[in-house]
Amino acid sequence: MLFSQIVATSRDVGATRSRKVKVATLREALTRLEQAEVEPVVAWLSGELRQGRIGIGWRTVADIPATPADVAAVTVSEVDGTISAVAEVSGSGSAARRRELLADLFARTTADERDFLLRLLTGDLRQGALEGVMTDAIAAAADLPIEPVRRAFMLSGRLPATAVAAFDGGVDALTAFRLEVGRPVRPMLASPAESLADAWSELGGDVSVEYKLDGARIQVHRNGDEVRIFTRTLREITGSVPELVALVARLPCTSAVFDGETLALTDSGRPRPFQETMSRFGAESARDLLLHPYFFDCLHLDGVDLLDSPLEERLKALERVAPQHRIPGLIRPDSEGAATHFDDALAAGHEGVMVKSLTAPYAAGRRGRAWQKVKPEHTLDLVVLGAEWGYGRRTGYLSNLHLGARDPDGGAPIMVGKTFKGLTDALLQWQTDEFPRHERARDDHTVYLHPDLVVEIELDGVQVSTRYPGGLALRFARVLRYRPDKTAADADTIDAVRSLLPG
């Protein structure tokens, strides 16, 4: 297939807000691929390279001289082959050799193809083909039910591998995917609840009520003497957290996969600010700040996969090997006990509680109602779409944030409000320094950003409004913190915002 056809597909997907049209457009492209083209094309249309990170940034590619070709003639295989060659370059003179390979490729591409390549190589490709949309398209193109495709993706963590299995082996190949110790699975996610009473009413009394910590999500894998630790985005941080590795290596088991949180504590045992915990992920300078693990789930133990087991069984497995490292929680408390546990969590400096169905399996990568988070105030994780230059004491700083919710159908984030409340002097300075790195456009008053940054917003509620495209507006929104552990795909959807409407 010609590379230009993939570029056209990307353009068409990005030009529509309709999930149905996105899926149909992707399905049509996928059905025309040769077997060897499936893996790279699915990766590209998901905004990534099948080779992973290859050490290419804007400095490498932006000034490569090349006159665009008049006719589109480069094939998918040629582009993928060049990227593989670039990825394999190492040693002395590697930068020059990478530029040479890319210059040769760029000289054979049209202007549209080069623009797509530049954005793909530098991680700046955004065409609206989010993972859920691509998963649907793979199922449709392979003429398979969606559930085995979705499950295979959640267990493999990679859409290209899932697509290859779907096209080559159908349902049998997809169901062959299993939890593999050492390979992270996508984490199960929680939905916000209006109140403890609402969560209790929806899930009934057959629940676990646990502290919701103000920490960083971790997934811990142990296979014999080897321990590997991953973030919620599946990035490995094993080398940055030796104290967690040592602790898990001492647990009385031979193989395990735990889900949990980690955080730094003060001398009095209260949680330190979230940013201090995050500073440990890759920061040598923060090694004197010890992290503590708090596990709340066990997905595998000593050769037995537990993903499909009810939460109650998974908690029993966790209790057998790591009772002293479990997040504080109650099993089947009465309503009074649950309320007391909620108050205790707040008094200890934590965010609130999680209410979880004891009968639910671990739905990797899914945000459902089996887990519900309860906080004293409403909070949303939103995408920063832009920022306005301040005035008065904020003159010279990027201040008033434009906030967007995720479109569940894969379109661009939907603006739902603005705020400058809660911004400290340090945050104002950080925004002013950082935002230009994510800039897509600007005018005299505003710098508009690519949807890269996620910020946690506290708000009093939501109201109907015609001021913003989503038909909603945030009430008394204020910035709590930025979430470097989350991507735009982790932001709350417009449906989550709408669920906070009164009545």
Swiss-Prot record:
Its cofactor is Mg(2+). Its EC number is 6.5.1.1. The keyword DNA repair applies. GO terms for molecular function: ATP binding; DNA binding; DNA ligase (ATP) activity; metal ion binding. Pfam families: DNA_ligase_A_C, DNA_ligase_A_M, DNA_ligase_A_N. Keywords: ATP-binding, Cell cycle, Cell division, DNA damage, DNA recombination, DNA repair, DNA replication, Ligase, Magnesium, Metal-binding, Nucleotide-binding. The active site is at 212 (n6-amp-lysine intermediate). The keyword Ligase applies. ATP binds at residues 210, 217, 232, 261, 296, 367, 373. It catalyses: ATP + (deoxyribonucleotide)n-3'-hydroxyl + 5'-phospho-(deoxyribonucleotide)m = (deoxyribonucleotide)n+m + AMP + diphosphate. One of its GO terms (biological process) is cell division. DNA ligase that seals nicks in double-stranded DNA during DNA replication, DNA recombination and DNA repair. Belongs to the ATP-dependent DNA ligase family. NCBIfam families: dnl1, PRK03180.1. This is Probable DNA ligase. It comes from Rhodococcus opacus (strain B4).
